[in-house]
């Protein structure tokens, strides 16, 4: 898969861009393992669905559930997505 460098600023609700789209793609790899959750539209917009998915992810792995994709959330998303993708 891929493991892009952390974008140096936390991603949060309302943000747009390639970093958000990359994170959405990685989240979709994870979400595909959990059929009770819908996959995200990979549009590069950090909207309600992306925020909810990030919060669920943070809660599931024991991070602070704030909906912000900071360094630890970013690294965790891509690390887990890569493990799933390569398995």
What spans do the regions from the language model cover?
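Acidic, Ser/Thr/Pro/Gly-enriched interdomain connector segments
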Residues: 1-44, 84-87
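Conserved hydrophobic/aromatic packing and binding residues within compact polymer-binding modules
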Residues: 54
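Short helices/loops that flank or line small-molecule/ion binding pockets
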Residues: 58
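Terminal recognition/anchoring or ligand-binding modules at protein termini
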Residues: 65, 80-87
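Short, basic amphipathic alpha-helical segments that act as recognition/interaction helices
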Residues: 74-80
């Amino acid at each position: 898969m891929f493991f892009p460098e952390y974008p140096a600023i936390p991603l949060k609700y309302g943000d747009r861009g390639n970093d958000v789209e990359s994170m959405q793609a990685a989240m979709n790899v994870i979400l595909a393992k959990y059929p009770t959750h819908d996959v995200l539209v990979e549009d590069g917009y950090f909207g309600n669905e992306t925020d909810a998915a990030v919060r669920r992810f943070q809660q599931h792995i024991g991070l602070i559930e704030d909906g912000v994709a900071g360094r630890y959330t970013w690294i965790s998303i891509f690390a887990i997505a890569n493990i799933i993708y390569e398995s």
